UniProtKB/Swiss-Prot annotation:
It is found in: Cell membrane. Keywords: Cell membrane, Membrane, Transmembrane, Transmembrane helix. The chain crosses the membrane at residues 1-21, 357-377. This is UPF0754 membrane protein BCE_0952. The lineage of its organism: Bacteria, Bacillati, Bacillota, Bacilli, Bacillales. InterPro entries: DUF445 (IPR007383), UCP032178 (IPR016991). Its main location: membrane. It is a multi-pass membrane protein. It comes from Bacillus cereus (strain ATCC 10987 / NRS 248).
Length: 378
């Protein structure tokens, strides 16, 4: 009975010692968190292994992530995976479609994105661009003559239109002098003519009478305006003036209209601020609807594919620029010892517990062997 009690005792003690030893060894990986001193003498094995080697652990974790986990080959393979690409394209299409079918106005959406004063800034920018383009255009064209500035087709149209312009002018003049207003105006002109020619012509005017002179002059004026020779004369005059104009510099326009006035007139006609305001008041859906299908079906898949292709090609360079090893190292270095302990234990809790049990099992087995040895020795 004493023999079996001894074996049971040695087995129990061995199990307790083995389990406790392993448990203590595991605890000593993390604890104590700080070095302990007796006077000036530092107690051995303090701090624990992981607190003591935390900086080295951070460096090694950074290297492990870069060299074995997030490798260029692994990421490149993932980026070129067909299923991954399809999934990413589908996700991008859904997200872009959500934005393009949004019923909010552009103004409200931009305000949500903290884009302030967008209307004023866009208006000023557009006006600035228009102003610069107009000024550049005028600077260039002011160095030309009208013959150089106007296209050949415009020259042909103007020259072919001159006879029609002559006919139009003469036709309107004929209509005017045939009207009562024209006759009255002609009568006044005759009065003024005789009034400026002295006493003799006044006597002639009084002798003939004003009305009879108008009645005689009016048909002659109308007859003159209707003659082919008059039309040809006016056409020749207009043609000569056109030839003179072609040889003159466009810059002469500035004598009558300054650049600033031209720019101001064009900006007023364009109504940039009003146009921008109307555009911003439209919903995102209204603005995007004409291009929505093209964007979803063609642009998004093409853009995602090109980005992934570029990423796969340059993944090594991107990872080098990111300095992942340094990021991991810095993050781990900022962990408190308690957090680092919780992190490791959350991953290895079951395994460490099994190590404790294994220590107890081995200790118990050693206790049994010791008991058997004692039995044989007696």
């Amino acid at each position: 009975m004493n023999i079996w009690l001894s074996m049971l005792t040695t087995t129990g003690l061995g199990a307790i010692i083995g389990g406790f030893t392993n448990h203590l060894a595991i605890k000593m990986l993390f604890r104590p968190h700080r070095p302990m001193y007796i006077g000036k003498f530092q107690v051995p094995f303090t701090p624990g292994l992981i607190p003591k080697r935390r900086d080295e652990l951070a460096v090694q974790l950074g290297k492990m992530v870069v060299e074995h986990l997030l490798t260029p080959e692994g990421i490149g393979k993932k980026l070129t995976n067909e299923e991954f690409q399809k999934g990413l394209i589908h996700w991008a299409q859904v997200e872009v479609d959500k934005v393009m079918t949004n019923e909010q106005s552009l103004r409200n959406m931009l305000e949500k994105w903290n884009v302030a004063h967008v209307e004023k800034e866009v208006t000023e920018k557009i006006e600035q661009v228009i102003t610069e383009k107009i000024q550049a255009f005028l600077e260039e064209y002011y160095t030309y003559t009208w013959e150089q500035a106007l296209p050949h087709s415009v020259h042909e149209k103007i020259e072919s239109a001159i006879p029609n312009v002559s006919a139009f002018i003469l036709g309107r003049a004929t209509q005017f002098f045939e009207s009562e207003e024209g006759k009255t105006r002609l009568s006044k002109m005759i009065d003024d003519f005789f009034a400026s020619r002295g006493t003799l012509l006044n006597l002639v005017g009084m002798f003939l009478g004003n009305v009879s002179v108008v009645d005689r002059v009016q048909p002659e004026v109308i007859k003159f305006l209707g003659q082919d020779g008059t039309k040809q004369l006016l056409t020749d005059v207009l043609q000569k003036e056109w030839e003179k104009l072609k040889g003159r510099d466009v810059k002469e326009v500035e004598t009558f209209v300054e650049k600033e006035m031209i720019v101001s007139s064009i900006l007023s006609a364009v109504k940039v601020e009003e146009t921008v305001s109307k555009f911003l008041n439209q919903s995102v859906q209204q603005v995007c609807e004409p291009v929505r299908e093209t964007m979803i079906e063609k642009v998004v898949p093409s853009a995602v594919t090109k980005v992934l292709k570029w990423g796969a090609k340059n993944v090594e360079s991107i990872l080098n620029k990111l300095h992942l090893a340094e990021i991991v190292q810095q993050e781990v270095s900022t962990f408190s010892t308690e957090r680092l302990e919780d992190l490791v234990l959350s991953i290895t809790k079951n395994e460490l517990k099994m190590i404790t049990y294994l220590g107890a099992l081995l200790g118990g087995m050693i206790g049994i062997v010791q008991g058997l040895l004692l039995l044989f020795l007696k």
